[in-house]
């Protein structure tokens, strides 16, 4: 049991490192490609890699039972919108702040679950979520960096859409193999990104920019790191309880800070640092009951 949990923890740490590397590569390419193009290149590379792996490690592509397609399509759409909003913020603001906005998903999940899943909300959980909301307000300061109304809006949207994707994943387990969900997400996002590149959308899609020689490397690395991150994430949740894995996901913010500083981001000021700290505390407090429950079983 302990070895399995240790393996799961190792997997989530590797997943967060890979996602941090992917975000750094997206920031590098953001000077040339639009967020929509980065979504497409990230997704199409991931799709090709998954298709290459499939013959060596096949899995069930058909659903276990009927009724899951609409939920899968919804997961693809909200997951894609979350990625698009996140990639926009990576271009405009510091990597740490963009990542912090995205990692607010558990806070929104707490607030949305009573409405969407009819789950009863505990007072302690609500207080934890409110702490996180205060953190969001602190990092949404227009006087800091380039965090304007659009960046704040995109940041909140990225967190909300990620939370909706997580909520949907709970139901999808009954219908599809986990690997099939990953492939469907990658393929669906490739289609959405491809169509989106031909539509002029302010801030998000500004036409098609033909990849230069040096861009091929960055595009490949974005896809490879994103695919590895997704696989490590899947294996983490397959080998260890979610209550133990979920709190560790916040190390992604640390990688966002470190890679951002390496790429030239300024260090967060006191107000933004406090906001990120509150978001971290909020997520940990939300996950704490499940964490303690799982630790007692060891």
UniProtKB/Swiss-Prot annotation:
Record keywords: Cell membrane, Membrane, Repeat, Transmembrane, Transmembrane helix, Transport
TM region(s), chain numbering: 5-25, 36-56, 76-96, 97-117, 124-144, 147-167, 181-201, 216-236, 244-264, 272-292
Location of the EamA domain: 17-141, 183-288
Entry keyword annotation includes Electron transport: no
InterPro entries named in the record: EamA_dom
Bilayer disposition of the protein: Multi-pass membrane protein
Cellular component GO terms held in the UniProt record: membrane; plasma membrane
Localization annotation: Cell membrane
Pfam families: EamA
Domain of life: Bacteria
Family listed: Belongs to the EamA transporter family.
Protein name as catalogued: Uncharacterized transporter HP_1234
């Amino acid at each position: 049991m302990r070895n399995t949990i240790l393996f799961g923890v190792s997997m989530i740490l590797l997943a967060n490192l890979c996602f941090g590397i992917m975000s750094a590569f997206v920031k590098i390419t953001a000077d040339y490609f639009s967020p929509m193009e980065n979504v497409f290149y990230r997704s199409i590379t991931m799709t090709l890699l998954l298709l290459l792996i499939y013959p060596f490690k096949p899995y069930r592509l058909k659903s276990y039972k009927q009724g899951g397609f609409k939920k899968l399509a919804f997961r693809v759409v909200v997951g894609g919108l979350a990625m698009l909003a996140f990639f926009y913020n990576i271009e405009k603001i510091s990597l740490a702040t963009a990542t912090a906005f995205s990692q607010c998903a558990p806070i929104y999940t707490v607030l949305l679950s009573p409405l969407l899943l009819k789950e009863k909300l505990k007072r302690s959980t609500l207080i934890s979520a409110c702490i996180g909301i205060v953190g969001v307000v602190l990092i949404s300061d227009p006087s800091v960096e380039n965090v304007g109304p659009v960046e704040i809006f995109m940041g909140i949207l990225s967190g909300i859409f990620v939370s909706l994707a997580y909520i949907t994943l709970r139901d999808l387990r009954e219908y599809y193999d986990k690997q099939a969900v990953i492939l469907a997400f990658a393929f669906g996002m490739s289609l959405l990104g491809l169509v989106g590149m031909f539509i002029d959308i302010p801030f998000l899609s500004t036409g098609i920019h033909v990849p230069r020689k040096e861009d091929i490397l960055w595009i490949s690395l974005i896809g490879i790191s994103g695919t590895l991150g997704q696989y490590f994430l899947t294996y983490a949740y397959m080998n260890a309880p979610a209550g133990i894995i979920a709190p560790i996901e916040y190390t992604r913010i640390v990688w966002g800070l470190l890679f951002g500083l390496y790429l030239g981001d300024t260090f967060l000021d006191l107000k933004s640092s406090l906001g990120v700290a509150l978001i971290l505390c909020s997520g940990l407090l939300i996950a704490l009951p499940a964490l303690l429950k799982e630790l007692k079983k060891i």
